[in-house]
Design a protein with these regions (language model features):
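ATP-binding/phosphotransfer module of carbohydrate and carboxylate kinases, centering on a glycine-rich
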Residues: 2-48, 85-87, 109, 154-158, ...
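Phosphate-binding/catalytic loop of phosphoryl-transfer enzymes
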Residues: 50-177, 291-306
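Short, conserved acidic/polar surface loops in the N-terminal third of protein domains
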Residues: 1-4, 62-64
């Protein structure tokens, strides 16, 4: 939760963990109270124009979270309407990848670009947002950009969405860990990864830094699949750039080179060398807060109290 002014300055912020609230109505109640409290402490509630929210599987067109797999509540949640009715202000809800792209365009690596793609690699999976001619492309139902659920391996790993071979099962944090476990199970080759108490993208990367061949193979395979996915995306959309963001961007030093190699191998020849592959320069939390503030300005002002 944050207060952001018209210049994009983050005035105040605090954290609320959705996992602490298994009952949706309890979360909405606490969230509403915190929004009012942080506003009153920083200029007054009457100074707030609107609220922007970043959420997984959110549909900007309906203001709902729809069948998200990585939050405690299931089904369709009309979050914008629920919150608006409690706090009496305009509320806009956007898909987390869409919010990330808004933050990148306004304040980050995509500043000044008209056509670009933001790909978020994180703990929950892989999301993306397409900007075309200066505007986000949401699709008919608001689901455009689900790169993580594009099938990249026929008959591959089962995905939480119910299908097999989705990209996020190979390049998200859980996908990287699965690759490491598969490689260790398939070979008796010694590896520092076998001695790790906890396998994570970062601990695997640290093994890479120590020259561990199997750990390096994990990220070579990750980059190979990510490069194919990005090449298909670039061939379809012909953007100025593809920007990688999310929790896994800090691991990019281990997978960026094989990603670029695979991208150049698989992208359409006429645009090879013309699409930049970039890693976001913004802090993840700051970027998403700023992106949500940009979204808040797009919704028509509404208030029960002004």
């Amino acid at each position: 939760i944050a207060v952001v002014d018209i210049r994009g300055t983050i005035i105040a912020k605090e954290f609320l963990n959705t996992k602490d609230y298994p009952v949706l109505n309890n979360f909405i109640e606490v969230l509403s109270e915190r929004i009012v409290m942080i506003a009153e402490e920083n200029g007054g509630y009457e100074m707030v124009r609107s609220v922007g929210i970043s959420a997984p599987s959110a549909n900007f067109l309906t203001g709902s979270i729809e069948n998200a797999m990585n939050i405690p509540w299931k089904g369709v949640i009309p979050l914008a309407a629920m919150l608006r009715d409690r706090i009496g202000l305009a509320v806009a809800v956007g898909n987390d990848a869409h919010i990330t792209a808004l933050g990148e365009k306004a304040y980050g690596s995509a500043h000044g670009m008209e056509s670009f793609i933001v790909v978020s690699l994180g703990h929950g999976g892989v999301g993306s947002c397409i900007f075309c001619n200066g505007q986000p492309h949401l699709g008919t139902g608001g689901y455009a950009g689900e790169l993580g659920h594009c099938c990249i391996v026929d008959g591959g790993r089962p995905c939480n969405c119910g299908r097999q071979g989705c990209l996020e099962e190979y390049v998200s944090d859980r996908g990287i860990v699965k690759t490491a476990r598969e490689l260790m199970a398939a070979s008796d080759e010694p590896s520092l990864m076998r001695d790790l108490e906890t396998l994570t993208p970062m601990t695997i990367g640290e093994c890479c830094d120590k020259g561990d061949a199997m750990a390096q193979k994990v990220y070579q395979q990750t980059g190979f699949y990510l490069g194919i996915g990005l090449a298909n995306y670039a061939t379809l959309m012909n953007p100025d750039a593809i920007i990688l963001t999310g929790e896994l961007k800090d691991a990019s030093r281990w997978f960026m080179e094989p990603t670029e190699e695979s991208f150049n191998e698989h992208v359409f020849g006429n645009i090879r060398g013309k699409v930049k592959l970039l890693v976001s320069i913004l802090d993840n939390h700051e970027r998403d807060v700023l992106g949500a503030s940009v979204l808040a300005w797009t919704v028509k002002e509404y208030s029960l109290f002004k």
